[in-house]
Amino acid sequence: AGHEHIVGAVENRHDVERAFALKPQLVFHMAGLVSYRHSDAQRQRQVNVEGTRNVMEMALAAGSERVVHTSSIAALGIPAVQGEIADEGLAYNLAGLGLSYCDTKHEAEMVVLENFRRGLNVVMLNPGIIFGDGDSHGHHHAIFRAMSRGGLLAVPSGGIPFSDIVDVVDAHLAAIEKGRAGERY
């Protein structure tokens, strides 16, 4: 099996239709806009929610055999009891806090589940803050530098949810064969 590189934007339905004209059997939907700036809220809705809608609907129409949707730990919410560790069954409880990244990743999961109910074979992954070789996000490096100097002033109860890129890649590959459709991990 081969692959073809197609440049486009997930929020542009025409671009997504062009990509799915190739009838891909396996789809990794990893596109998303990570930001906690209020000024990015509208763009996040376009990319994270409408882009996900485009990909899921086109994957269903194309008859894709498996879709792996990269969501985020931010779509899970926060446990009701401080210090409790959340799992994939945690109900989203961050609505109304003005966190558009969290809200849009959760809404994207609702779009994914809607398409699962329509017959799409899709698995969701919820990694934490991804870091590793090739990481271009300076704020991740700043966190580690601060920790190494003893200068990280606050760590939330339950810790910081870091995910090594190698583990995230392994999870995506495992999701192809082992993930249960409609579930998140």
PLM feature spans:
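NAD(P)H-binding glycine-rich loop region in Rossmannoid oxidoreductase-like domains
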Residues: H3-E50, M58
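Conserved Rossmann-fold NAD(P)-dependent oxidoreductase catalytic core, especially the SDR/UDP-sugar
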Residues: V47-Y101
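Active-site Tyr-X1-5-Lys
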Residues: G96-M124
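Alpha-helical substrate-binding/gating segment
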Residues: F144-L152, G158-Y185
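Conserved cofactor-binding/catalytic machinery of classical short-chain dehydrogenase/reductase
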Residues: N12, L26, G51-N54, R66, ...
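NAD(P)-dependent short-chain dehydrogenase/reductase
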Residues: R118-P161
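Conserved catalytic-site region of short-chain dehydrogenase/reductase
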Residues: Y36, I73-G83, I130-S136
